[in-house]
Amino acid sequence: MTYEIKTLSCNPAKLKGLSEKLIVSHYENNYGGAVKRLNAITAQLESLDFATAPGFVINGLKREELIASNSMILHELYFDGLGKDGEPDKDLQSAIVESFGNLNRWQTQFVAMGKAVGGGSGWVLLTYSHRDKTDQPMGRRPHLLSRWRKSDSCSRYV
């Protein structure tokens, strides 16, 4: 399978608080790089003889596939969310209030988690726990989680 770089869905020149140069660079280098990297890893996996390949090779490629895939998907969700009004819809507001008490408490915690991401590389996501029936912030390295799909809980927040 070959992955394609999606068209940037917002106009970077019209975003408030983010420079056009920053958005274009992040889109081309980080997102575009993740897609290219995922395609390279996919090609390696397609040509790999799993019956004879050493376990560490399989493990390494599958780990890198997971990281690149999540990076691609999370960047797509991020860029698709830019240019909106920044306010959660009523259903999301209700869910946040139910889980955190009020929007301000959630926003304070969410922003603090973003500032705590070391080196400026990583994500903070608002996810939904089906087990606990609550919204939960998750930070740091969600690239290492099982693959996200637009149908997963994170799509609810885009």
Predicted features, each with a name:
Residues 1-158:
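Feature for soluble, non-membrane regions of globular proteins
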